[in-house]
Each structure stands twice: as structure tokens, then as C-alpha cells.
Design a protein with these regions (language model features):
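Acidic anion/phosphate-binding donor-loop and adjacent secondary structure
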Residues: 88-90, 116-117, 130-145
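N-terminal pre-catalytic "stem/leader" segment of glycosyltransferase-like enzymes
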Residues: 1-58
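Short hydrophobic beta-strand element within catalytic cores of glycosyltransferases
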Residues: 224-227, 234
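Conserved catalytic-core segment of nucleotide-activated headgroup transferases in glycan assembly
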Residues: 133, 142-189
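A charged, aromatic-enriched C-terminal amphipathic alpha-helix characteristic of glycosyltransferases
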Residues: 267-301
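Aromatic "clamp/platform" in nucleotide-sugar-dependent glycosyltransferases that forms part
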Residues: 207
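Short alpha-helical donor nucleotide-sugar binding micro-motif in glycosyltransferases
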Residues: 194-199
Length: 302
């Protein structure tokens, strides 16, 4: 059996994705483990790991670090989860190493296009991620009163531009009587399935996403998903994954007006709200589970 080591962290999306991948890959004859990149490892540990594993998988910036520790290029694979990953690697190391390592992948077509824009000659494989649908499945709420953020409230991109815009969700929801915003911190990924019990809808207000776990998880949990057309939702939204909100950039009022209209409608029409949640959940069942996406990872890692 092929042995793969994900050099990653056990927090946020990285932990969620790589733990799930390790379970799924085993079904296809690939043994996968996780190595915490927040820890230091001795030269002897690196040597032993190199003798044990056939392939080391991490993001573009960390793959250079592994090479410096002694892992040879023919055992290195990188998968970019965001534009930031590729831009940091380019800033520190240029684009040459993409041609030297064994495999180069990205998690979405958005990033495949960005790789070309960034001057990376090697064409990456697209390896989208999924979720465990049954883990997130919940009965939809009976009515719409509680709104949650889809991901972080505030984040600036590589060019110092605010891309999450959680403040727009807050200022919009505060103006709608009977609807409350559920504030939350950065939860460990293992807390997220139960988190969706505390909200009736999830809003993604980003102007930039590479993929988008929150809209997938919320859909599987039977929550109303409202999102700008970013990441996976650019395709999944029109196909049945939720309600598409205008990007509202630079005119943020377009986003706020559309969000208000949708929330008020589903707040006042409970039957329509429940049916919409059920439709979104069924779309998630048919499209988001790891069983729909694991083949691309197996092919990539083999």
C-alpha cells in the first residue's frame, strides 16, 4: 500500500480536510497520516519519516520547508488551498520549484486559473474536497430567526484588501426585526457539525474564496445557504446549492439589499423556508459527500 504523509495542522479547514482524506484514502489502498507542522522535528525523525512514507503532501510554502529539512523533490507534492499559499511561495522561492516536485495540485478551478495568472508554467491537477454528509446532517429548522457567518468575519488578502466583510452581514441583520446574528469564535473543526444546530441560515459575504467549506457544511446540515458567487458556490449556487447574493464590490449596498430581501422573505414564509432548506440539503447529499470527490485525490496521489 502506498504511504502518504500530510504535513498540516489539526485546526480549521486543514484538519477537517486531511483527517477526512486519511479515512477515505484507506478504502482505496492508500495509508495516510498527519504530521503537525506546528512542531519541530529532529534530523533523525525526518530521516525516519523519509524512510517510511512514499509521498509528503502540504501547501506550496511548506513544501519548500520540507525540502530544506531533507525530503527529496521526488517525494514532495503540494496542494494549494488558496491564492495566499501560492503567492507566499512565489514571494519567497519563485515558481521554479513547482517543476521540480512530484505533484502539484489545487483545490478548485479558481486556483487553477490563478496559478496561470501568477506565472506558474506547470498546470496543476484540480483535487476538490468534500465533506462527510452524514456527519453534518440535521433536520432543518422550522423557521428563520438565527443567522450565522460562513467562515471568518474578517480577513485581509495578500494585497491588504478585506475579503470576508462580516460587518456587512452584521449591519444588515441588525436592521431586520425578529432576526438575530449568532456571533461565534474560531471553533475547532470537530465542533462544526453541532454548531449548525445554533443557526437557521449561514451567510457567506466574501468577495474572494478559493473553495468554501461553510456553504457545503451548512447545506448538509439543512440550513439556508446565502452566498456571493465565490469558490465552489459560483457553480454550486446556480445548480441548487443555495441563494446567490451579488458580490457587491465595490458597491456594497447591492449585497446588503439582496440579503435583506431574501432574509425577510424566508422569515415571513416558513413553509417556503423549510422547503428551500430541504432542497439545498438534497443537493448537498448528491454533490458534496467525499464519495463524489475522492477519486480525483486517489488519482492525484497514486
Amino acid at each position: 500500500m502506498k504511504k502518504v504523509l500530510f504535513y498540516t495542522q489539526n485546526r480549521w479547514a486543514f484538519g477537517s480536510i486531511h483527517h477526512a482524506l486519511a479515512k477515505e484514502l484507506y478504502k482505496y489502498g492508500i495509508i495516510a497520516n498527519l504530521l503537525d507542522w506546528t512542531q519541530q522535528y529532529s534530523p533523525e525523525e525526518i530521516r525516519l519519516l523519509n524512510d517510511t512514507y512514499d509521498l509528503f503532501v502540504t501547501n506550496p510554502e511548506a513544501v519548500v520547508h520540507l525540502n530544506r529539512l531533507g525530503i527529496p523533490p521526488n517525494k514532495l507534492a503540494t496542494v494549494a488551498h488558496g491564492q495566499w499559499d501560492m503567492l507566499l511561495a512565489r514571494r519567497d522561492n519563485g515558481n521554479i520549484f513547482y517543476n521540480e516536485i512530484s505533484k502539484f495540485g489545487v483545490v478548485s478551478n479558481v486556483l487553477k486559473e490563478k496559478a496561470s495568472e501568477f506565472g506558474i508554467e506547470r498546470v496543476p491537477d484540480v483535487v476538490p474536497f468534500g465533506i462527510h454528509f452524514d456527519l453534518f446532517y440535521r433536520k432543518p429548522s422550522d423557521n428563520l430567526t438565527r443567522i450565522g457567518y460562513g467562515g471568518a468575519k474578517e480577513t485581509k488578502n495578500f494585497f491588504d484588501l478585506e475579503i470576508k466583510r462580516g460587518h456587512l452581514v452584521k449591519q444588515t441583520v441588525e436592521k431586520i426585526p425578529g432576526i438575530n446574528l449568532v456571533e461565534h469564535g474560531f471553533y475547532n473543526w470537530m465542533c462544526m457539525p453541532a454548531y449548525y444546530n445554533s443557526v437557521d441560515a449561514v451567510v457567506v459575504s466574501s468577495i474572494e474564496e478559493s473553495a468554501g467549506l461553510p456553504s457545503m457544511e451548512a447545506a448538509a446540515a439543512g440550513r439556508l445557504v446565502l452566498s456571493t458567487p465565490v469558490g465552489y458556490f459560483a457553480e454550486n449556487g446556480p445548480a441548487g446549492g443555495g441563494i446567490i447574493l451579488p458580490l457587491g464590490h465595490p458597491d456594497e449596498s447591492e449585497f446588503c439589499s439582496a440579503l435583506t430581501e431574501s432574509l425577510v422573505f424566508y422569515q415571513q414564509n416558513s413553509d417556503a423556508y423549510v422547503q428551500k432548506c430541504l432542497d439545498i440539503q438534497e443537493f448537498a447529499r448528491e454533490n458534496y459527500d467525499w464519495s463524489k470527490h475522492i477519486a480525483s485525490w486517489v488519482n492525484f496521489l497514486s
